[in-house]
Amino acid sequence: MPDLHTLPAGSRPERAIRNNGPSDLALERYKLRELAEGWPCYRDACEWENLRSIFHPDAHIYTTWTGLTHHLQFIEASKTGMDNGVFIMHRIHGSTTDIDPSGVRAVTKMKATITQRFSGLPCVSGGTCEADAESDCRFIFFWEKLDGSEYPELDQQWRARFVRHWYEKDKLIAVTAGRDPVIDLEKLQQYPPGYRHLAYLQESTMGVKVLLDLPGHRREGSTVNGQKHDLFQEYPMLHGCNSYKDNRGFPTTLKSIALREIRMKYLFDVI
């Protein structure tokens, strides 16, 4: 078991404002909480226009079933999935925000549970049954307050440039007591503990290939998921998301960067 209580050096940006601070920045943090909580509230209710209003026009996100994708592609994939019977909901538990002193960059960490209903599963007692796979996560939002130079209509609006999830703990719940789904336990163990049942059933029922190297909890230690949590590597600094882009127009260094590193660099090195 890794040392869970000594966080990696630099994991807490010393110049970030959080918890109290100036009233004007507290108001900005409140705005960011409202935006972050909009993801699950708007997506689950199919309020697509409201969901789009959270993101920068060139924002990208990462999920188990889409991988790295543009937010508009994620919305279209969500619509298609819903039309095909995919039933994903979210529960919000709380959030914190680190904001830079100038009030133009911020990072929000939102605790939430992703819960997906799977129907028509083979049942241990015969027939079929339903089950909910749930993963407790941290949604990490990287915000920029736009100055209107590129998008005048968005002047002084906060928009998410990038969103990624840390998958920390999951479980499988039978919808009806005594009606448990048949599980291939050997295959199940091939998936990461933070989203094991979710990944197992997404691959089994949705025809997708789930990414297996997404960030997990620190207790996962030397596994790829534990390493992604604490990954430390050198990379070009993010500068307005306009440099160091790959062939999909996205900064290559954001694909697997550590939370502690990107928080510090995003908040301060580009100011």
Curated annotation (Swiss-Prot):
Q: Which InterPro entries match?
A: NTF2-like_dom_sf (IPR032710), SnoaL-like (IPR037401)
The record's section on SUPFAM superfamilies has: NTF2-like
**Region feature (Disordered):** 1-20
User: What family is it from?
Assistant: Belongs to the PEP2 family.
Under which name does UniProt file this protein? Uncharacterized protein ATEG_07673.1
Give the source lineage, highest ranks first.
Eukaryota, Fungi, Dikarya, Ascomycota, Pezizomycotina
